[in-house]
From Swiss-Prot:
Domain of life: Bacteria
Similarity comment: Belongs to the HupK family.
Organism: Bradyrhizobium diazoefficiens (strain JCM 10833 / BCRC 13528 / IAM 13628 / NBRC 14792 / USDA 110)
Primary gene name: hupK
GO molecular function, one term: nickel cation binding
Protein name per the record: Hydrogenase expression/formation protein HupK
Stored InterPro entries: Ni-dep_hyd_lsu (IPR001501), NiFe-Hase_large (IPR029014), NiFe/NiFeSe_hydrgnase_LSU (IPR050867)
Length: 362
């Protein structure tokens, strides 16, 4: 069976003059995991997941392993839990940096080399089931810290003046003349059990268009920031979202370096839902990722569902749509660029197309 799927989100912005009257989102297609893997041994799936999920593949592997262990009634050893947390954090840092640069700005030679160094060092830390020697871990973390500094991010979350990142932040606000004052809601680990119960009960009907008591909460960097401090919906523009991402990169780098401070609650969480049933949540770069599995008596897959952050943030009634509807744009290309910047600041895990049309001219 082919593992290729339509990996793009189509976004249509309907304009009434300079005002966004509506936003339509055609979601990506998602791999039908139960249909692909029913009857296969759970242990055989781990090497396949990176082929299905090229971004945040470590987070997907950790979520799957944790869900399977929960279904089996097992608990990972403390050293394994710690290693999984480390590789999830390293991947999150790498993906946050990738989103700051890739498709946003052309990298000069120094910045490109620094990005490669981060990606290589993250890979050196190993996969979710591969512990690495402490000396290798220290070298990899030192390489990440040096590369992050080269990219212009300091430990105090400040941006180096004149850096590519500073220029990117400075240039991405100011063209969305006004934004609607939508009341935000944010996904947290406290919502996990409600979500995984729906995921197993309703399958793709839920994961394609999830909700939480009728609401579509935001997940990701901005939601994590909102969990730590009070923020205003009026401050949620592209530049503020980029600054939040940059601040989190610095925070993650510090944690990798020292590793002795509490980072967040529930970065990796698992739940036993009954005999042969388990689920897990992993807080990855773009938000909270869920896996849920049902196994038979021989640990073969009966049901396997997943819910990625993009399904919340790019929901037809979700945070992106609510951030755009009712906004007034500057005229011409600058206004369209402002919309593109806001869409990009939500950091979808797949590509997107953006089309502008006049309402009434469908």
């Amino acid at each position: 069976m082919s593992l290729s799927f339509r990996n793009e989100i189509d976004i249509t912005v309907w304009l009434s003059g300079a005002t966004i009257a509506d936003v339509a989102i055609q979601p990506r297609s998602r791999p039908p995991l139960t249909r692909l893997f029913a009857g296969k041994p759970a242990a055989s799936l781990l090497p396949v997941l990176p082929r299905l999920f090229s971004l945040c593949s470590v987070a997907h592997q950790v979520a799957f392993l944790s869900a399977v262990e929960a279904a089996q009634g097992q608990e990972a050893a403390p050293a394994t839990v710690r290693h999984r947390l480390t590789v999830v954090v390293a991947e999150r840092l790498t993906e946050l940096l990738r989103g700051l640069f890739v498709g946003r700005r052309a990298l000069d030679g120094t910045s490109a080399a620094a990005m490669r160094a981060v990606m290589q060092a993250s890979a050196l830390l190993g996969g979710p089931s591969e512990a690495v020697p402490q000396a290798l871990r220290r070298d990899a973390v030192a390489q990440i810290r040096t590369a992050v500094g080269t990219l212009g991010i300091s430990e105090d979350h400040a941006l180096a003046s004149g850096s590519a990142l500073a220029a990117s932040v400075e240039g991405c606000d100011g063209r969305l003349v006004s934004r609607p004052l939508a009341e935000p809601s944010f996904l947290t680990a406290a919502n996990d059990l409600d979500i995984v119960a729906r995921l197993l009960a309703d399958g793709a009907a839920y994961s394609d268009a999830p909700d939480l008591c009728g609401q579509i909460p935001e997940t990701g960097v901005w939601a994590r920031r909102a969990h730590r401090e009070e923020i205003s919906s009026t401050a949620a523009g592209p530049a503020a979202r980029l600054r939040a991402r940059i601040a989190e990169v610095a925070q993650l780098c510090t944690w990798l370096d020292h590793g002795d401070a509490d980072l967040e609650r529930g970065i990796v969480a698992s739940y036993r839902l009954g005999a042969g049933k388990g689920a897990a949540a992993v807080e990855c770069a773009r938000g909270r990722l869920y896996h849920a599995v049902v196994l038979d008596d021989e640990d073969r897959i009966v049901n396997f569902e997943f819910l990625a952050p993009t399904e919340w943030n790019f929901h037809a009634r979700g945070p992106l749509v609510q951030s755009l509807k009712g906004a007034t744009l500057a005229a011409g290309r600058p206004g369209q660029d402002a919309v593109r910047a806001l869409v990009g600041s939500f950091d979808p895990c797949v590509g997107f197309s953006l089309d502008f049309r006049e309402a009434g001219h469908a």
